[in-house]
Amino acid sequence: MPAIEVGRICVKVKGREAGSKCVIVDIIDDNFVLVTGPKDISGVKRRRVNILHLEPTDKKIDIQKGASDEEVRKKIEEAGLTDYMKERIKIKIPTL
């Protein structure tokens, strides 16, 4: 099971959207992927993200590479993961 693959649901661990869940829509190169929330579900805008800023979960939806936000939203609703995607995760910042 590859951790970084199209359709994998991840948690953003860095940045202003830290703690929000997103879906990998496309793999750009070895370091970056294209993700979306979609924004109206989890608050994550469609954008390029460094893979070091993502924590993959065990959940995956079946979408095509480059799927639109509407297609992603439809698949999330079909899988019954809408409430799961809306949940925010509390990120623990290590203290020095």
From Swiss-Prot:
GO terms for biological process: ribosomal large subunit biogenesis; translation. Keywords: Ribonucleoprotein, Ribosomal protein. One of its GO terms (cellular component) is cytosolic large ribosomal subunit. InterPro entries: Rib_uL2_dom2, Ribosomal_eL14, Ribosomal_eL14_arc, Translation_prot_SH3-like_sf. GO terms for molecular function: RNA binding; structural constituent of ribosome. Gene3D superfamilies: 2.30.30.30. Belongs to the eukaryotic ribosomal protein eL14 family. This is Large ribosomal subunit protein eL14.
